[in-house]
A protein has these predicted regions:
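Expand to "…catalyze enediolate/carbanion chemistry for C-C bond making/breaking, isomerization
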Residues: 1-340
Length: 340
């Protein structure tokens, strides 16, 4: 009898929760876009690149900027198919043109479309529906995932409904706009660490977003760190986002931030080894209860350790060769450094 994999037995026939690269790096100008794509080609798909139409386009030149973005998606610099785009918000007159220009002209569909300044479910649903209709019109085979930016009172109030929209794969927190929306009631110290993790209203927002994502199998993506010189601050921000708030992805706005973010979200070597040993024993036991170092394990803990191995692969960490069958790989295939 063939050994069953974790994905086949641990989720009761449902699709395992979404897993995306743990870092989402933003670039708005052509120069920065090309530098970001070159870095992604070098490091591999351990981080996404988001080409920014919202903040990247000069006023009056939105179409030209969208055409630039389209020319890079699926082009020679897009080696891994992990390039997304942020379009303009619902109130901006050019958001539909962003979608049409990019989906029509890009050599392949973007990995995702990020929608900023979401105000309510109705607006988000309309934008998602337009993206879906446009990809069908242009003969794009698969749906284009959407990622919603939660940075308004209205979006936070409806965050669980937003997470349930069919094409949504991730929710991101927009810290700066969220703090600014309180008209001075939240001090500017909450726009950076440690205030961004300690102020009660900001903590509440982050926790609500993470809870909504996990309830619906979406990915919670943490806001940027404004620190661009001391990377230990960035690493600490990423660690707090992961450990205290349940985030599994984080934005980057400077190339130097990518490595500390990826490292912070990656499992440690000892965690990977433990997860491999527990899951291999479980697989040998046909996924019944097992005992590991005087601790009992069952399918609930197996799901946790499976998430460790999936994150290890998605962050480029080496998974022990003997654990390859857990992923359905041929034994002896060696470590795979792509998304799990």
């Amino acid at each position: 009898m063939r050994a069953l994999t974790p994905a086949e037995v641990l989720f009761d026939g449902e699709t395992p929760p979404a897993l995306l690269p743990v870092c989402d790096h933003y670039a708005g100008s052509e120069k920065l876009m090309l530098k970001s794509l070159a870095l992604q080609a070098q490091l591999g798909p351990v981080f996404d690149v988001t080409l920014d139409c919202e903040d990247g386009a000069a006023v009056g030149h939105e179409a030209e900027h969208a055409e630039l973005v389209a020319s890079l998606i699926g082009g020679e610099h897009d080696r891994h198919g992990r390039v997304g785009v942020r379009i303009h918000d619902f109130a901006h007159p050019h958001w539909r043109d962003d979608v049409r220009l990019i989906l029509r002209a890009a050599k392949r569909a973007p990995a995702f479309v990020t929608v900023p300044k979401v105000r309510n479910v109705a607006d988000a649903a309309e934008m998602c529906a337009f993206i879906e209709a446009t990809r069908r019109e242009f003969g794009i085979e698969k749906p284009v995932p959407t990622q919603l930016l939660i940075e308004t009172h209205g979006a936070l109030a409806e965050v669980f409904r937003l997470a349930s929209l069919p094409t949504v794969e991730a929710l991101s927190f927009g810290l700066m706009d969220f703090v600014s929306a309180h008209d001075g009631a939240i001090p500017d110290a909450a726009m950076r660490s440690p205030g961004q993790f300690d102020h009660p209203l900001v903590r509440r927002a982050k926790l609500e977003i993470a809870a909504a994502c996990h309830a619906h199998g979406r990915v919670p993506s943490h806001n940027v760190s404004t620190e661009i010189h001391d990377m230990s601050v960035v690493a600490a921000d990423a660690a707090r986002a992961r450990d205290e708030f349940g985030y599994t992805r984080m934005w980057s706005i400077h190339p130097a931030q990518i490595e500390p973010i990826v490292s912070a979200f990656a499992p440690r070597d000892d965690e990977i080894a433990t997860a491999s040993e527990i899951l291999l024993a479980a697989q040998a036991a046909q996924w019944g209860p097992t005992r590991y170092r005087d601790t009992l394990h069952d399918r609930a803990s197996y799901r946790y350790y499976w998430s460790v191995l999936r994150r290890a692969r998605s962050t480029g960490r080496t998974v022990p060769e003997q654990a390859a069958p857990l992923f359905g790989d041929a034994a002896g295939a060696g470590p795979v450094r792509t998304q799990g």
